[in-house]
């Protein structure tokens, strides 16, 4: 037990995952209406925008490492906060939502408001397809 606490304490010294940055929003995605924008914020923006709401567990290793990695990868793939109508990955995002890959189940287990119904997924897919550059 003591050894486990010592290891847990030592994990907190690893600096990766400490820094939680939300760069400025340059250009937000053009959602067709506020309801779809809210749906996207709930299901996508934690990892795919510069508007991440960093939960408490994202400050504690090893979860901080996983959350930081997910956000970095998500922003690299598709970032709704630096939207470029000519160069975006909306078609890939639509496919991922349609195939049930996004949002991932490991995320929706902790954030049930991001778990999309079939109708919500269809609405989000249609909006993403309409925004494809």
Region spans (language model):
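Stable alpha-helical elements in mature extracytoplasmic
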Residues: 32-36, 43, 63, 67, ...
